[in-house]
């Protein structure tokens, strides 16, 4: 299965008639493995800061999580495993696997919990596969 299939079928999937706004699978080095057409153009330093927060939990809290120039307020996640951010009625969930970061961006009417389930389910599966 291609990485694009994971994004299209497992991240941008239909949940009660709704779906994520954007999604991507990005390597720890910042390379894009696959992304939805709507995923924001990001800067390498934005991904580097996210990776740093996985290694040093809490490092993003003072500045916020930035992706594609959008700032998200960091909310409770799972240190070293999941980072969650909020902006208005939407937000972002980032799950770290052995080799990649799984990104999900959502907006109302999708809920934070639904985004977490979508992103973390794929991330957990990839971890089980050694990825």
Curated annotation (Swiss-Prot):
A motif (Involved in PIP2 interaction) lies at residues 81-97. Phosphorylated by MAP kinases. GO terms for cellular component: cell cortex; cytoskeleton. The lineage of its organism: Eukaryota, Viridiplantae, Streptophyta, Embryophyta, Tracheophyta. Binds to actin and affects the structure of the cytoskeleton. At high concentrations, profilin prevents the polymerization of actin, whereas it enhances it at low concentrations. Disulfide bonds join 13-115. This is Profilin-4. The variability of the residues taking part of IgE-binding epitopes might be responsible of the difference in cross-reactivity among olive pollen cultivars, and between distantly related pollen species, leading to a variable range of allergy reactions among atopic patients. SUPFAM superfamilies: Profilin (actin-binding protein). Occurs in many kinds of cells as a complex with monomeric actin in a 1:1 ratio.
């Amino acid at each position: 299965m291609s990485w694009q299939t994971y994004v299209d079928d497992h991240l941008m999937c239909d949940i009660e008639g709704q779906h994520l706004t954007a999604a991507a699978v990005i390597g720890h080095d910042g390379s894009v493995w696959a992304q939805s057409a709507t995923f924001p153009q990001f800067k390498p330093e934005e991904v580097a800061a996210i990776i740093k927060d996985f290694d040093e939990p809490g490092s993003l809290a003072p500045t916020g999580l930035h992706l594609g120039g959008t700032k998200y307020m960091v909310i409770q996640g799972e240190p070293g495993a999941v980072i969650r951010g909020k902006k208005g009625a939407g937000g972002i969930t980032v799950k770290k696997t052995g080799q990649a970061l799984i990104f999900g961006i959502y907006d109302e009417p999708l809920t934070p919990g639904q985004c977490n389930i979508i992103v973390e389910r794929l991330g957990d599966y990839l971890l089980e596969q050694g990825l």
